[in-house]
Amino acid sequence: MKYIIVTGGVMSGLGKGITAASIGRILKNRGYRVTAVKIDPYLNIDAGTMNPAQHGEVFVLGDGSEVDLDLGNYERFLDIELSGPHNITTGKVYRSVIEKERRGDYLGDTVQIIPHITDEIKCRIEQAATEGDENGAAEICLVEVGGTVGDIESMPFLEAVRQMRGELPEDEMVLIHVTLIPEDTMGDMKTKPTQHSVKALREAGLYADMIVGRSEHPIGLHTKRKIASFCDVAAQAVVSATTVPDIYQVPVELEKEGLADAITTHLHLDRREALEEWYNVVAREYTSRITVAIVSKYGIEDVYLSIKEALKHAGRALATEVKIVWLDAERYEPCQLADVDGILIPGGFGIRGIEGKIRAIQYAREHNIPFLGLCLGFQLAVVEFARHVLGWKDACSEEIGDGRHVIAILPEQEGVDDLGGTMRLGNYPVTVKAGTIAEQLYRRSTITERHRHRYEVNPEEISALEEAGLVFSGLNGPRMEICELPGHPFFFATQFHPEFRSRPTRPAPAFLGFVSACRKNKKTP
């Protein structure tokens, strides 16, 4: 197993996760089997209970793990399926060590950060790295150490990496440090922040083999040589990673900088020619443009990162640029929906913004605007239909109020008090009905999709909803998973989250259908 450790310095938010995913992609382009591990140095067990406004999207893996959004980037860039062990948190590590101490596994030892915590970290990295899938075990494992070098929270993880480096042969680990190269008012690139960041890395007992400099403009040879001189790396090991308009362009830029060659040389991997698949995806040109309104609770785009990317995947496959208009569910005006080509209601929880989302669904249904609802968007589509087609004015979800509960809590969720990891999570099979839009999109009778919810369509109300014209075209046993409206340009909603399985090379069918319908019903120039 070869390890690529990715650390970050100077500041957070540099795009370290995208850089790590892109490194994995350029190696996969050369035919290597690559997996990835994200280390999050927070005390939470996982991302499931974290405020998305602070932390961004909670990404759900196939095994039901609720993880950091960077794992979504890994899955999209590498086109792989990861599992919970690939997200290591301080909370998981400490809980495991404390449980072992309580069982007596340490035989009376004084339990300390070194060696017990660091041993647990190393064990978890190695277990995740060697976990295989249908394609076999990986050859290369990317390990992104979250946070910034110098943070107190990251120190045990950096120490574990230091120990691993000493235990492994030199050609089995490479450390890539991602740092910021700012410019002064005269446009000159400043290397001092990078020098200090590398110094902090050395203080942790680690040294960088390669440096990726994040900058607004390409890093010139003079600056690269200066960084190389002060940071003890070769000039060709200093790589420029400029800001690009499309994140899927980053692997192409890193390949041009020679990073793949530098990594394979350091790790003594055989040289292989890069495959063209990724470059063909990136190079596709747009022939049309649509505008999609996302009516949401949060005004932070990272909360809906996978939806943004899934729209981009579908748009690229259909040569259509997708412009997103973000509308606050509590404040938007109906006139703002008049000129969009499609309306999307994402998942979410709680009562805030619910009525605004329902009004947007009603507008889409009555004005024949393509509509896609996801998770909560699916549930609210049922509520809207019950209110305005069946005339049940008090129709609502059990989650949000009293009235006629067309959306009810799942039986297994009754009496559940703990919030973390207790929802209906991960992959479940969905049976697709013949002769429906769902069948046209998926072209299969059974599909597998990822879930994250506690509520479902009330079984007692299904017959009345179907008799009024709502079609439930996807089922999981007694549970309704997909609904659609015949005769509408595109009115489609899913209880599951199709965005979590969308890939640049394999867009999610629900998003393909939505973007295609938006193109056909295009209003915007």
UniProtKB/Swiss-Prot annotation:
Matching entries from InterPro entries are given as: Class_I_gatase-like, CTP_synthase, CTP_synthase_N, GATASE, GATase1_CTP_Synthase, P-loop_NTPase
**Top-level taxonomy:** Archaea, Methanobacteriati, Methanobacteriota, Stenosarchaea group, Methanomicrobia
Q: In which pathway does it act?
A: Pyrimidine metabolism; CTP biosynthesis via de novo pathway; CTP from UDP: step 2/2
Superkingdom per UniProt: Archaea
Enzyme Commission numbers on file: 6.3.4.2
Entry similarity comment = Belongs to the CTP synthase family.
Glutamine amidotransferase type-1 domain boundaries: 292-524
Where along this sequence does the record place binding of L-glutamine? 348, 376-379, 399, 454
Give a single Pfam family match: GATase
Q: What is this protein called?
A: CTP synthase
- List the catalytic activities from the record: UTP + L-glutamine + ATP + H2O = CTP + L-glutamate + ADP + phosphate + 2 H(+); L-glutamine + H2O = L-glutamate + NH4(+); UTP + NH4(+) + ATP = CTP + ADP + phosphate + 2 H(+)
Q: What else is known?
A: CTPSs have evolved a hybrid strategy for distinguishing between UTP and CTP. The overlapping regions of the product feedback inhibitory and substrate sites recognize a common feature in both compounds, the triphosphate moiety. To differentiate isosteric substrate and product pyrimidine rings, an additional pocket far from the expected kinase/ligase catalytic site, specifically recognizes the cytosine and ribose portions of the product inhibitor.
